[in-house]
UniProtKB/Swiss-Prot annotation:
MF terms (GO), sorted A to Z: Atg8 activating enzyme activity
Gene: ATG7
Record's protein name: Ubiquitin-like modifier-activating enzyme atg7
Pfam name, any one: ThiF
Taxonomic source organism: Arabidopsis thaliana (Mouse-ear cress)
Effect recorded for residue 558 to Y: In peup4; loss of function
Domain of life: Eukaryota
């Protein structure tokens, strides 16, 4: 009786597993928010894997932060350089904008497209020059950046050869090679791995000569190896640890061998390591039979498989980073999210770096100061300094959003201190500080004993303004805004002024300082700027700032306004600052008028018009924009005042504080009022003469 033919054993491959480092998702989130927006074009990425280095744990293909394109201007990146532990593998990422789009992806078509790329590389010979293309992979994903959760699915396209590859023999490499051969093969492998030129080349040839000397060569050198060996093996870095199965990369490797060289019997070498050195006890050597079905050509594209299983099921994986992230870092990402989303569609030209780096000084931490601070935070501004001398009163928390009942207990917390604490509680990443300080005011004379303290406050205020980029004038009285207005004009700092009446409000931005404007103009397009500066808060006054606090009734001492005014005015003040920061001319930007400007086509002002003044009334639910030029007689920002301050310094400030008429005399307002009074008297005389003539007639 004839013996029964032993059935062929089909070669089984251990699937390749994926691993995604958290850094990859963080980097991808930044790329999505900052650059991609709604663009869902495929992204070239790089995965990394290496030979198995543990007898019980397989190696994974890993995505790291460096897996994404390094060139921010291009989403098609060349394969990153690897090292002995990170062999680079090209891949493609398909990220969808909605979970519905993710679920509707044609996964079979995507897999086939990537498999076709591998086959084209095999046919063109590229796979011989760069074998890393053989384990090419793809990833589909959906990133919910609001919740910091990610859904993803890997595929490792692998060809299904028909008929299947038959396994003839498989054994540990230490049993296949003689002791002399094993020693030489180990040394050759270690040299290959130690060389910077070959350490990350995962496919190679192992040639053993008749005198037991081993050498390792590139795949493209196969013809040079013909007849020069006793044993020739096709080696590859095997990520699998199993003793009876080779790893997934061998599948496409065998397809390459069959297609390029028409070999029917192949010896393969599954290279594995232990502690960074070749381990022939873990490594495998096998013999496989590769045959073509009748009528099939070696150039026919085989079918492909490769979607990774998740716990044995064909479903995607998901990960949430919210729980693992530092709460402050998570808050920073969440706060930045809405701003970055603005750039996707609504405002692509928005410069977020300018906003995040600006330093704001808030003079006044009352009703307006609280509203301004909250709105600044919404725009991503992190550096805020409060200056205030008052304490939190029982009446404050309901109108001033940064304070609560506990801040009022005892004698009350200083507002500048309580405001800082509140901002930190709202958003821990805020860089904020509070300064408890009174602002010296003209019309409020001081004694000689107080001079040192007042001048110290003046110096400190000047230093604060110099160290900040924008200053908000939000104090309760008009005269308390004079010194900050002067110092801002002197330092050429952005000054935003907001003031409230009972049912009306005024928000304005000050123009550039008088002595700095001429210097800045040399670097600006003259056609885009006004030849005259924009005015400040005091430019329309014909009197110097005076004491507005003495001899006042209770309703005049307190800020009595309709509660809705402060949120409106505070928001407008911040929007005005953001407009200035986004404008190419900054503080020198001209004042726009809402009735004359075209808000739909303004390249210089991406946020819309940039007015000089905004005045509104809630009693009439109306709002208008006004334009006012700087006055040569202004008591705060005129060149006369700034020059006098620079020349006299402290003595000038003391004289302005102690002598109410000094500023009027200095700027010529005294003479102007005298001329106006004389003009009125002349008219009265003329009217009297005319009456006399009429009577005579």
């Amino acid at each position: 009786m004839a013996e029964k033919e032993t059935p062929a054993i089909i070669l089984q491959f251990a699937p390749l597993n994926s691993s995604v480092d958290e850094g990859f998702w963080h980097s991808f989130s930044s790329l999505k928010l900052d650059k991609l927006g709604i663009d869902d074009s495929p992204i070239s990425i790089t995965g990394f894997y290496g030979p198995c280095g543990h007898p019980q744990v397989s190696n994974h293909l890993t995505l790291l932060s460096e897996s994404l394109p390094l060139d921010e201007q291009s989403l098609i990146a060349s394969t990153s350089h690897g090292n002995r532990n990170k062999c680079p593998v090209p891949g493609i990422l398909y990220n969808t904008n909605t979970v519905e789009s993710f679920n509707k992806l044609d996964k079979q078509s995507l897999l086939k497209a990537e498999a076709n790329k591998i086959w084209e590389d095999i046919q063109s010979g590229k796979a011989l020059e760069d074998p890393s293309v053989l384990p090419r992979f793809l990833v589909i994903s959906f990133a919910d950046l609001k919740k910091w959760s990610f859904r993803y699915w890997f595929a490792f396209p692998a060809f299904v050869l028909d008929p299947p590859v038959s396994l003839i023999e498989l054994k540990p490499a230490s049993e296949y090679f003689s002791s002399e051969e094993a020693e030489s093969v180990s040394a050759a492998c270690n040299d290959w791995r130690d060389s910077d030129l070959t350490t990350d080349v995962p496919f190679f040839l192992v040639s053993v000569s008749s005198d037991s000397k081993a050498s390792i060569r590139h795949l493209k050198d196969l013809e040079a190896c013909q007849g020069d060996h006793q044993k020739l093996l096709f080696g590859f870095y095997d990520p699998c640890h199993l003793p009876s199965n080779p790893g997934w990369p061998l599948r496409n490797y065998l397809a390459l061998i069959r297609s390029r060289w028409n070999l029917e019997t192949v010896w393969f070498f599954c290279y594995r390591e232990s502690r960074g050195f070749a381990d022939l006890n873990l490594s495998l050597v096998g013999q496989a039979s590769i045959t073509l079905s009748s009528g099939e050509s070696a150039e026919t594209v085989p079918n492909s498989v490769g979607w990774e299983l998740n716990k044995g099921k064909r479903v995607p994986r998901s990960i949430s980073l919210a729980n693992s992230m530092d709460p402050t870092r998570l808050a920073v990402s969440a706060v930045d999210l809405n701003l970055k989303l603005m750039r996707w569609r609504a405002l692509p030209s928005l410069n977020l770096n300018v906003l995040s780096s600006v330093k704001c000084l808030l003079l006044g931490a009352g009703t307006l100061g609280c509203q301004v601070a909250r709105t600044l935070m919404g725009w991503g501004i992190r550096n805020i300094t409060f200056v205030d001398y008052g304490k939190v009163a029982m009446s404050n928390p309901v109108r001033q959003s940064l304070y609560n009942f506990e801040d009022c207990l005892g004698r009350g917390e200083f507002k500048a201190v309580a405001a800082v604490k509140s901002l930190k509680q709202i958003f821990p990443a805020m860089e904020t500080s509070g300064v408890v300080m009174a602002i010296p005011m003209p019309g409020h004379p001081i004694s000689s004993q107080e001079e040192d303290s007042v001048l110290g406050d003046c110096k400190r205020l000047s230093e604060l303004i110099e160290s900040h980029d924008a200053v908000f004038l939000l104090t309760d009285t008009r005269e308390s805004r004079w010194l900050p207005s002067l110092l801002c004009a002197n330092a050429n700092k952005i000054a935003i002024n907001a003031a409230l009446g009972f049912d009306s409000y005024m928000v304005m931005r000050h123009g550039a300082g008088p002595t700095s404007l001429s210097d800045d103009m040399q670097n600006l397009d003259i056609n885009k700027t006004n030849t005259q500066r924009l005015g400040c808060y005091f430019c329309n006054d014909v009197v110097a700032p005076q004491d507005s606090m003495t001899d006042r009734t209770l309703d005049q001492q307190c800020t009595v306004t309709r509660p809705g005014l402060a949120p409106i005015a505070g928001a407008l003040a911040v929007e005005l600052l953001v407009g200035v920061l986004q404008h190419p001319l900054g503080i020198n930007a001209k004042g726009d008028n809402s009735s004359l400007s075209n808000t739909g086509n303004n390249d210089d002002s991406p946020l819309g018009i940039l007015p000089h003044q905004i005045r509104g009334s809630v009693s009439q639910f109306s709002q208008i924009t006004l334009l006012g030029q700087a006055s040569n007689s202004c008591t705060a920002c005129s060149e006369t005042v700034i020059s006098e301050y620079r020349e006299r310094g402290n003595s000038f400030i003391l004289e302005a504080i102690n002598h109410p008429t000094y500023l009027e005399d200095l700027t010529g307002l005294t003479e102007l009022k005298k001329a106006a009074n004389s003009f009125n008297l002349d008219w009265e005389d003329d009217d009297t003469d005319d009456d006399d003539v009429a009577v005579d007639l």
